[in-house]
């Protein structure tokens, strides 16, 4: 029996201070019951809240060292719940877990986003029986309670098959509930919510850590045996645990001003991160594509499958490194297209014992923490052998299967299956993959006699295809330089096979194989810079993204390109510094410069340059340039303005395909493609600042200040997010009415996000107007008017009328100005932070739209933190006096860590 589920032997005396239900759990386990035996786990373990935790950013403080003696286990393959994880789109979702894991909060978030009802199982029991569980137990015999419990549970699940989020407490996972949940999980997502010991102990207000630890060890296998998915609620620390500065006698007026100007971490930020993580997890794990597109950021590369792009990279990180070190996860992922988590932890030296008992929770915690800090897909890869570099020990079939199946519970975008295992093992994995894509992996430690020409490799590829893999990854150590040319021939050989073929990742490992890694087109494993010292150990790659990219440009596969910001007055632009820093860290020899012109004709200079890669478009040419375009993105066409131009070098075939193939390649320009990323930056900032209490619903109201190009982008961002009631105020009413008519004429029902055609746009004619009585107060405000003096026009010094900001739950205000940064509007909103208002300014929006432009220009992921840092540094150098506050800017960056969207 695997230690993953084997109950620790306990004496009954160990449980003397636990309540009767806890003692029953320990006694039953002590008598040898397996994880699949129905066990009573209900308990009233003190008072608790279901609130989620607080925030600590993206620094990875190795919380798993504490887990090593604190949490539970994997469930044996024969006891674990195996389902296909394919669900009808409207299937109700069940959340289970012990008290204090945050189930109720997560249910509310999920229901608000999906438009579903929350059903609390305990309240349902009380409604059906007229008694709460505790009272019913006291008034009836145990057998009567069990009988009634079974009836109520069956009724609960049968009555709520669709469009509900069902929250089950410990009482629902007793004897009868386990069986019914396992049956329900065949057609519905049943998600086990997990949390760390310290947070659970805090919420339960339990003093004895050891007793809570024992209960977690025992309850884990039970909950896993009747659920098909698992979400680890990562508790963040450092905010709620700290005394507020406002409570200190040293809190000065200067402190108050800095606090207002750096107010990005509002009290709801911890909930916001949790909300984003959980909604993304549910969309991924259930295969809800429309909701997934809504949860993912609208960056261009999110819309393209990785396997369809050229020269993509997977940052490869062993879980052992994350468990043992304080790691900056965002730095590890920077510019990569995927994050590969290698499960390389060693098993116990016995096939019977399998792996360590705490491993399941460590893996779940690691996956959740990594996901919090990345925006790219995750590849979950279990090493087939442990200690691979010294006396390798192959995992047992059961151990390998347990680890991979546990990974599938976590809903990774990709999971690998090792093709060295038997078909019977691999079929179990592939049959339960759900929405995850499967990469068939095969790594030779000793190359076959004929190397890549050996028929064995094609046979392995065909076997992976027959098993149902979505991609194939093959690798062997290089013994000569010629092996690098041989693997190229092998990839070509696969392409020439008849019928549709799977994407192939094929390369040589080791120092001699680095050349093949540079030219492998799909998901080349790369090592993050911070792990270079470990290159060649733990089976890590031997090349970084920067080295791979530099090799492609040095060998003339790709060309150095020139990019610009084009406008009438662009000397103040922060974009050149931001993009040039990004090119450098990515290993690209590109240059981004200012090109200023008093007329639109200045664009001719750009398009005559064969190395022209694209340009940002500034005022006043965002609309003037449209007649010159060969094509436009749907976003730019709807907005009626362009801020990004990309050259077209081939007019044959689809424009999208031509643009993808021509990125980073020089040549004559045949046309121009226009896009708009302003709306992306605005939309991301709205989502970042909008609290869970203000989740977008049909009744949500948005307000636009201004009627220019940025106001157009702001309206489009709101529609894309699903806002159905939008108001415009502009000093010139006629321009506001013209803008409203523009969008009311459009049919945006095919919008890629959660937007719909059922929106209405109204014009407010005066700042003295009361807010319309038939509409809720706005919770989203976007200001697109300049805050500085223009010509003879004085700075507007705009502030919102008090009667327009009476939302009881606050909201978010995005001011697109950053000249100056601390506008009257921003000061007004920051002074209302205690009422739930969040303020974001132009320096929040600018890098976000810049990330999207970088992707459009290069087809590669942007180094987000670096670009943000450069923007703030450049702003510091341009601004004088008190406008720039170094402490404020540092706080701004820290608050954005762990906020990929």
Swiss-Prot record:
Claim: Transcription is one of the keywords in the record: yes
Gene name linked to the record: qutR
Keywords noted in UniProt: Quinate metabolism, Repressor, Transcription, Transcription regulation
UniProt feature, compositional bias: Polar residues: 31-43
SUPFAM superfamilies assigned: Aldolase, Aminoacid dehydrogenase-like, N-terminal domain, NAD(P)-binding Rossmann-fold domains, P-loop containing nucleoside triphosphate hydrolases
A Pfam family hit: SDH_C
Function description: Multi-domain repressor protein that negatively regulates transcription of the quinate utilization pathway genes. May mediate its repressor activity by binding directly to the qutA activator protein.
Endpoints of the signal sequence: none
Species classification: Eukaryota, Fungi, Dikarya, Ascomycota, Pezizomycotina
GO BP term, pick one: chorismate biosynthetic process
Domain comment as written in the entry: Is homologous throughout its length with the C-terminal 3 domains of the pentafunctional AROM protein. The function of the 2 C-terminal domains may be to act as a molecular sensor that detects the presence of quinate pathway intermediates as a prerequisite for the presumed conformational changes necessary for the control of transcription regulation.
GO molecular function: 3-dehydroquinate dehydratase activity; 3-phosphoshikimate 1-carboxyvinyltransferase activity; shikimate 3-dehydrogenase (NADP+) activity
Domain of life: Eukaryota
Keyword Transcription among UniProt keywords: yes
Renumbered residue ranges of the record's region Disordered: 26-59, 878-901
Entry-linked PANTHER family: AROM/DEHYDROQUINATE SYNTHASE (PTHR21090), QUINATE REPRESSOR PROTEIN (PTHR21090:SF27)
Protein family: In the N-terminal section; belongs to the shikimate kinase family. In the 2nd section; belongs to the type-I 3-dehydroquinase family.
InterPro entries reported in the protein's UniProt record: Aldolase_TIM, Aminoacid_DH-like_N_sf, DHquinase_I, NAD(P)-bd_dom_sf, P-loop_NTPase, SDH_C, Shikimate/glucono_kinase, Shikimate_DH-bd_N
Name of the protein this chain belongs to: Quinate repressor protein
């Amino acid at each position: 029996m695997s230690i993953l589920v084997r109950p620790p032997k306990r004496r009954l005396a160990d449980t003397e201070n636990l309540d009767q239900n806890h003692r029953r759990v320990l006694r039953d386990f002590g008598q040898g019951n397996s994880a699949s035996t129905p066990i009573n786990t209900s308990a009233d373990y003190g008072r608790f809240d279901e609130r989620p935790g607080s925030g600590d950013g993206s620094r990875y403080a190795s919380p798993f060292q504490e887990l090593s003696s604190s949490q539970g286990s994997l469930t044996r393959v024969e006891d674990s719940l195996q389902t296909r994880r394919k669900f009808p789109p409207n299937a109700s979702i069940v959340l289970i877990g012990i008290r204090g894991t945050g189930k109720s909060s997560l249910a509310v978030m999920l229901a608000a986003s999906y438009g579903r009802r929350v059903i609390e199982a305990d309240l349902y029991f009380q409604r059906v029986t007229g008694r709460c569980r505790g009272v019913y137990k006291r008034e009836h015999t145990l057998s009567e309670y069990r009988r009634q419990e079974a009836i109520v549970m069956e009724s609960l699940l049968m009555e709520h098959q669709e469009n509900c989020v069902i929250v089950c407490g410990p009482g629902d996972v007793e004897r009868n509930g386990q069986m019914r949940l396992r049956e329900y999980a065949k057609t519905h997502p049943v998600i086990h919510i997990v949390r760390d010991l310290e947070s659970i102990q805090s919420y339960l207000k339990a003093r004895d850590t050891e007793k809570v630890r024992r209960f977690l060890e025992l309850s884990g296998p039970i909950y896993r045996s009747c659920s098909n998915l698992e979400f680890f609620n990562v508790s963040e620390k450092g905010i709620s645990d700290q005394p507020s500065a406002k409570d200190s006698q040293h809190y000065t007026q200067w402190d108050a001003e800095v606090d207002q100007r750096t107010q990005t971490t509002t009290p709801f930020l911890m909930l916001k991160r949790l909300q984003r993580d959980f909604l993304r997890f549910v969309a991924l794990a259930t295969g809800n594509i429309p909701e997934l597109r809504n949860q993912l950021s609208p960056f261009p590369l999110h819309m393209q499958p990785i396997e369809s792009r050229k020269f993509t990279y997977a940052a490869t990180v062993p879980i052992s490194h994350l468990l043992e070190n304080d790691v900056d996860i965002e730095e590890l992922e920077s510019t990569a297209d995927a994050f590969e988590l290698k499960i390389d932890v060693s098993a116990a030296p016995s096939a019977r014992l399998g792996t360590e008992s705490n491993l399941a929770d460590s893996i779940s915690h690691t996956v959740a923490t990594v996901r919090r800090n990345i925006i790219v897909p995750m590849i979950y890869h279990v090493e087939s052998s442990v200690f691979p570099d010294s006396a390798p020990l192959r995992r047992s079939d059961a151990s390998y299967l347990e680890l991979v199946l546990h990974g599938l519970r976590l809903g990774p975008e990709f999971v690998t299956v090792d093709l060295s295992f038997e078909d019977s093992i691999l079929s179990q994995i592939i049959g339960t993959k759900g929405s995850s894509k499967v990469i068939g992996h095969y790594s030779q430690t000793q190359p076959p006699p004929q190397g890549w020409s050996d028929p064995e490799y094609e046979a392995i590829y065909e076997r992976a295809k027959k098993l149902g893999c979505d991609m194939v990854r093959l690798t062997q150590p290089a013994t000569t330089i010629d092996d690098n040319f041989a693997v190229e021939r092998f990839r070509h050989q696969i392409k020439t096979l008849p019928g549709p073929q799977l994407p192939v990742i094929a390369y040589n490992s080791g120092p001699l194989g680095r050349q093949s890694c540079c030219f492998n087109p799909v998901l080349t494993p790369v090592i993050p810079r911070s792990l270079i010292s470990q290159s060649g150990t733990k089976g890590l790659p031997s090349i970084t993204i920067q080295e791979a990219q530099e090799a492609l440009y040095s060998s003339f596969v790709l060309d150095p390109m020139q990019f610009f910001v084009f406008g009438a007055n662009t000397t103040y632009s922060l974009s050149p510094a931001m993009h040039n820093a990004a090119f450098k860290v990515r290993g690209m020899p590109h240059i981004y410069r200012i090109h200023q012109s008093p007329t639109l004709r200045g664009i001719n200079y750009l398009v005559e340059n064969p190395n022209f890669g694209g340009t940002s478009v500034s005022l006043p040419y965002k609309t003037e340039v449209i007649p010159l375009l060969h094509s436009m993105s749907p976003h730019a066409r709807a907005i009626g303005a362009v801020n990004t131009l990309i050259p077209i070098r081939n007019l044959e075939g689809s424009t999208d395909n031509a643009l993808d193939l021509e990125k980073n390649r020089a040549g004559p320009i045949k046309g121009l493609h226009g896009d708009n990323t302003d709306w992306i930056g605005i939309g991301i900032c709205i989502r970042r600042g909008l609290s869970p209490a203000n989740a977008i619903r049909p009744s949500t109201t948005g307000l636009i200040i201004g009627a220019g190009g940025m106001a157009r982008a702001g309206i489009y961002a709101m529609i894309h997010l699903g806002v159905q009631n939008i108001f415009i105020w502009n000093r010139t009413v006629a321009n506001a009415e013209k803008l409203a008519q523009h969008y009311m004429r459009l049919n945006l029902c095919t919008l890629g996000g959660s937007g719909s055609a059922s929106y209405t746009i109204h014009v407010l004619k005066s700042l003295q107007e009361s807010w319309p009585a038939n509409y809720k107060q706005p919770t989203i405000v976007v200001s697109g008017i300049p805050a500085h003096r223009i010509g003879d026009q004085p700075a507007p010094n705009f502030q919102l009328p008090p009667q327009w900001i009476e939302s009881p739950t606050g909201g978010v205000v995005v001011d697109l100005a950053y000249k100056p940064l601390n506008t009257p509007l921003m000061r007004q909103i920051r002074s209302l932070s205690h009422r739930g208002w969040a303020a974001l300014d132009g320096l929040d929006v600018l890098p976000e739209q810049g990330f999207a432009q970088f992707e459009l220009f290069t087809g590669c992921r942007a180094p987000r933190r670096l670009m943000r840092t450069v923007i703030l540094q450049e702003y510091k150098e341009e601004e004088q006096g008190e406008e720039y506050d170094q402490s404020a800017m540092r706080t701004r960056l820290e608050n954005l860590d762990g906020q990929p969207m």
